[in-house]
Structures are given as structure tokens and as C-alpha cells.
From Swiss-Prot:
Cofactor-binding details, from the entry: Binds 1 heme b (iron(II)-protoporphyrin IX) group per dimer.
Protein name, entry field: Bacterioferritin
Entry EC no(s): 1.16.3.1
Organism whose genome encodes this protein: Rhodobacter capsulatus (Rhodopseudomonas capsulata)
Matching PROSITE patterns: BACTERIOFERRITIN, FERRITIN_LIKE
Keywords carried by this UniProt record: Heme, Iron, Iron storage, Metal-binding, Oxidoreductase
Residues binding heme b, per UniProt: M52
Length: 161
């Protein structure tokens, strides 16, 4: 089914955002793991994998609309140099994604592409959950301080390899 060209553009922009998030969350997972923040690292890894699912849905929709998914472009990665900064970087990426997805959802509704609109609605719901989680973690970091936050996110000694 031939899709609206601008809808396909929005889907490719969303794909770029998701591919960027996959890489960024994965690098943060590895950094956090290296810093001994096993619980924080586990969550970043889960987020990266969730973003892979988003990318897969977007690719399938682009192909259904007879478009060409562009997996060669990424937005610049924002890589934090410490625990709080990784959270801030991820939060900035989520805010950027939400802005794009809301604009895309509205355009899809205007042109009557309800399936693409629903995909963007689903992405918005997931990204809002990510924003809430990240804002909560930043607040915890600020209230507990670096040491308290590290203790909260460290794995128990008996879980060490």
C-alpha cells in the first residue's frame, strides 16, 4: 500500500531516533555496569532492547507503506560521563523523541493514516514512561547524593561474579 510521503518521512525520523536511543542506552548500560551500578545498568539494557522493538515496528510500517527504512543515519549520541549525566542525556533524548512523535501523530491524524497515528500514540505512551522514570532517578540522585545513589544501584555482594 503506497503511503503518504510525509508519513514515511516521519517514520524514518522516528526510526533514526529509536536507533540512536538503542546505541545510547547500550553504551550507558556498559558504562554503568563498569561503574558497579548493576541495577541502573540492567534498566539501561532493558531500555535499549525495548527501543529495538520500537525500531522493528517502525521498519515494518515503513515497508508496508512501500517506503525504504533508513538505518544508516543516527542522531548524535549523548553519552554521560557519570551516573547523573547518563540520566540527563537519556532524558534529553526522550524529550526530543516525544516532540517528534507528537508532531507525527498529529500529521498522521490529519491525513487519515490511523495505523501510523496509533504507532506514534504507542511510542508516546512508552516514551512518557521513560521520561517519568528518568526524572524520578534524577530526583533520587539529587536527594541521596552520589554515594547514596550508588548504594541504591549496586548489586549485592553475593551477586558479584
Amino acid at each position: 500500500m503506497k503511503g503518504d510521503a510525509k508519513v514515511i518521512e516521519f517514520l524514518n525520523a522516528a526510526l533514526r531516533s529509536e536507533l540512536t536511543a538503542i546505541s545510547q542506552y547500550w553504551v550507558h548500560f556498559r558504562l554503568q555496569e563498569d561503574w558497579g551500578l548493576a541495577k541502573m545498568a540492567k534498566k539501561s539494557r532493558e531500555e535499549s532492547i525495548e527501543e529495538m522493538g520500537h525500531a522493528d515496528k517502525i521498519i515494518a510500517r515503513i515497508l508496508f507503506l512501500e517506503g525504504h527504512p533508513n538505518l544508516q543515519k543516527l542522531d548524535p549520541l549523548r553519552i554521560g560521563e557519570g551516573p547523573r549525566e547518563t540520566l540527563e542525556c537519556d532524558l534529553a533524548g526522550e524529550h526530543d523523541a516525544l516532540k517528534l512523535y507528537r508532531e507525527a501523530r498529529d500529521y498522521c491524524a490529519e491525513v487519515g493514516d490511523i495505523v501510523s497515528k496509533n504507532i506514534f500514540e504507542s511510542l508516546i505512551t512508552d516514551e512518557e514512561g521513560h521520561v517519568d522514570f528518568l526524572e524520578t532517578q534524577i530526583s533520587l540522585y539529587d536527594r541521596l547524593g552520589p554515594q547514596g545513589f550508588a548504594l541504591l544501584n549496586a548489586a549485592p555482594m553475593d551477586a558479584a561474579e
